[in-house]
Amino acid sequence: EAAAAPLPNHAAPRGKAGLEGFDGLAEALGGTVLGQPDYLQKLVIALKRPYVMGREGESARNAFLVTGPADTGKHLSLCAAAEELARRGVFVSGDISWMDLSLYPTAAEEKLFLQDLYMALAAKGDIVVFEHYERCQPAFLTVLSNLVQRGKSPLAGRYVLQNGRLVDAGNALVTDAVGALTPRGKYLVLL
């Protein structure tokens, strides 16, 4: 069986701070995201959960859905939370990987989707946000569902890593074929 894509060196260790890094976080975010105290408290709970409950291996640290009307601070709150948690030493980086799933409406975009997903999961930040899931090819949503529910999503073909990118191996015999993707300990957020 082919292995899951290996972790880049920067993705293995996460920030050093633990639960104490979340103290007063909702209040701090309230200075940036105005008028949303209940939402910010729920966001902090979602981000804090894996530090309370724990997690195994490369499974997602947590997966959650952020909903609400346009222009209510969803993007801003995620960015502010990531930056503040990085500043506090909980996250290694304040970066967020964003994937617009409306770019993959048909099965013809499979290779592009897998490449973009791999790059998002391999990025330095701790959060991957998936936007416009309702406009995505349903088969690709199954990949995301597997990442959330099983902690791994098998790939239909075999891939190899070349210069940090997943490349279809076709029928080539390769020693380090990638047969699955893992969440790599990231937060997976549907927006």
Show where each model-derived region lies.
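Extended, charged/polar low-complexity intrinsically disordered regions
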Residues: 1-20
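Pre-Walker A (pre-P-loop) alpha-helix and adjacent loop at the N terminus of AAA/AAA+ ATPase modules
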Residues: 19-62
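Walker A/P-loop
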Residues: 55-98, 145
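Short loop/turn elements that form and flank the Walker-type P-loop nucleotide-binding site
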Residues: 58-61, 72, 91-92, 122-124, ...
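AAA+/SF3 P-loop NTPase mechanochemical coupling elements
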Residues: 60, 156-191
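Conserved AAA+/SF3 P-loop NTPase catalytic/coupling segment centered on the Walker-B
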Residues: 77-78, 110, 122-165, 187-190
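Short glycine-rich substrate-engagement loop in P-loop NTPases that contacts/grips substrate
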Residues: 93-126
